[in-house]
């Protein structure tokens, strides 16, 4: 990501520079998963709430928005994901947070973004990203979204065999993702209690 930052510094077009910044954030979100794994006592899984808090801090540092202007709160504990789920989950949250920070709070508007994680009774993981910003435009449909970020979200949700649903609120927007943990090669190590 440092190479992208160096390259972006030489670009004069603000739109192209923004594309480089978004790409750098995507790379950093993946690198952060690996950093959390290497620092943990279990190399097969990470505490996803802890990871998402670190990701929020990373996005603050790469934007002009401060925690005092837009608060980000991550709730949900004791949910551990192996890398096959953690990377796509992190990229989904990276895109949703980036979009909210960029579009939900125009004109120096203050607000908050809540990220909630929960394990449902059926064992599925529920991930909700909700903001109290200006909301989505009338007629917005996720499946018709033309931006790279929203297309990436849809592809990542498919990758984890999940579903996504978008709800317009009186104040803001709520994205809900539901998926089941992977039961791949690392499943036994990642979930010894199951």
What are these regions (language model features)?
Residues 110-123:
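Short beta-strand/loop element within the Bergerat-fold HATPase_c
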Residues 12, 21, 43-46, 64-95, ...:
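Conserved short strand/loop->alpha-helix "switch" segment adjacent to the catalytic nucleotide/phosphoryl-transfer site
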